[in-house]
Regions:
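An N-terminal assembly and electron-transfer interface module characteristic of large anaerobic redox
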Residues: 1-470
Length: 470
């Protein structure tokens, strides 16, 4: 992968034609993403949204034995504090760049922060996260990193997140994995092959259910999910194959392992729902190096499915129309599970979409061809779409589910739930039916005043989305 020689990886927009604004059906989006050059959409009015800095902060906080130095003013530290309060993570410092520093530079503050990080925590690795201000004052982070790496004898790794190169937050994950591949993950020629499959899941991925399934099926794995370790990342170079829980977040690592080290990555859908989990486990079991017999894998799947099916009889959706608002891989998996429960997928609201999602979009175009909205952090577009579609149930994350509830729609927030594996089936189904059968909160919230005037809500959902003109 020639990108490793470069200072930065290409953005998702350049590599895969990623879109962060779209309104249409599944077939139309698939057609657009299959074009040689995707026509980008821009918003004439944009409310909020995560950027690459936030994505990088989340992933860096999940690397065990590390300290992250956020080279920025206090604002980026506030984002990190929010992430830590929500999910915990590794230690971090902020250099507190001030007004003069943004013009004259803050190299001294950066070096002092590295010294303090090493004295305080004796970490295995130190990351220096550059932020938009550093893109302005042009601090020489590389020189500081090289100097301190020689001084302390541990990797000091720069991660360059300018905040405005890409409109997709997942590019922040690409930046972190690119930095690890460039500076840390070097293959040991004497290392023995690892008879296992790399289990890859990044920031925010809950894994207890799917790990229980892998153990029950007798599948050997190198755990690169949840809280990552440098040792496991290095071992990944010797595995026989890689499989992701969520390919959106980990795609750069998957592709780099395959292109640079010949470790094939299994293009399987997320292990959500009965069929999705079964397909995923069978793919992992078929990969070279998977321990345990085919009979053991099949026996475990049949037993776990039978237990889940019994529980699902009490949690049918009975034709309810559902609006799913999640990142792409999760959204497709949950949508399939909704159909397993007897629900109807009215619309998919995604954070982004790119050429890697074309196959799934084609599948849905052949099913119910639901509407697709790409609208991360755009409450106006979300409320407008919900008001026009009037679904029976909304499935999304907590901060966005509030908007659906205020619109009078039963809402289920799934970010606190482990949706993966057969255990995820038994955890997710009751959450959905409980929200659908107990709409009192939504009725109460909808009785209040709207955050948007009627004139705004009368506009089309894509009123502020325009095609880029070249």
């Amino acid at each position: 992968m020639n990108e490793i020689r470069q200072r930065l990886p290409r953005t998702r927009e350049k590599r895969r034609g990623a879109l962060t604004a779209f309104y249409g059906d599944s077939a139309a989006l698939a057609d657009e993403l299959e074009k040689e050059e995707t026509r980008q959409r821009i918003r004439t009015y944009s409310e909020t949204g995560d950027d690459e800095v936030i994505g990088a902060i989340r992933l860096l906080g999940r690397i065990r034995g590390s300290v992250t130095i956020i080279h920025s003013p206090p604002g980026c530290g506030a984002i990190k504090l929010e992430d830590e309060l929500r999910a915990g993570g590794s230690p971090w410092l902020i250099t507190n760049i001030e007004e003069n520093d943004s013009i004259l530079g803050a190299d001294d503050k950066l070096r002092e922060a590295v010294d303090r990080a090493y004295r305080t925590w004796r970490p295995e690795i130190i990351f220096i996260l550059a932020t938009p201000v550093v893109a302005i004052n042009n601090d020489d982070i590389q020189s500081a990193a090289t100097e301190k790496e020689d001084q302390y004898g541990i990797p000091v790794v720069p991660v360059y997140a300018a905040g405005f190169r890409s409109k997709t937050a997942v590019y922040g994950y690409d930046l972190v994995f690119h930095a690890l591949a460039k500076y840390v993950l070097k293959k040991d020629p004497d290392a023995l092959p690892l008879p296992a499959v790399n289990l890859i899941g990044t920031a925010g991925t809950k894994t207890s259910h799917i790990i229980r399934d892998l153990d029950g099926a007798g599948i050997s794995y190198n755990n690169l999910s949840g809280s990552l370790s440098i040792a496991a990342l290095k071992q990944s170079l010797n595995a026989f194959a890689s499989i992701a829980i969520d390919k959106d977040d980990s795609r750069f690592l998957l592709e780099w392992l395959e292109e640079a080290h010949g470790i094939v990555h299994l293009e399987e859908t997320a292990p959500i729902g009965l069929a999705g989990t079964e397909r995923w486990l069978l793919a992992a079991a078929r990969s070279a190096g998977a321990a345990g017999s085919a009979e053991q894998v099949r026996a475990y799947i049949e037993e776990a499915k039978a237990a889940a099916v019994t529980d699902l009889e009490w949690h049918r959706l009975d034709g309810a129309s559902v609006f799913i608002d999640l990142p792409p891989e999760q959204a497709f998996g949950v949508a399939e599970f909704v159909e397993e429960l007897g629900g109807k997928v009215a619309a998919l609201s995604l954070t982004h979409a790119d050429s890697s999602h074309v196959v799934r979009l084609r599948e849905w175009a052949g099913r119910s061809n639901p509407q697709v909205f790409i609208q991360q952090g755009q409450p106006f577009e979300k409320i407008n779409a919900l008001g026009k579609l009037k679904p029976d149930l909304y499935i999304g994350r907590g901060e966005a589910a509030v908007w659906a509830a205020r619109a009078g729609i039963a809402a289920a927030a799934v970010d606190s739930v482990d949706v993966y594996g057969f255990g995820g089936v038994q955890e997710l189904a009751p959450l959905l039916t409980k929200a659908l059968r107990n709409p009192s909160l939504s009725r109460y919230l909808s009785a209040g005043s709207s955050s948007y005037r009627a004139g705004w809500l009368s506009k089309s959902v894509n009123w502020h989305i325009k095609q880029e003109v070249k």
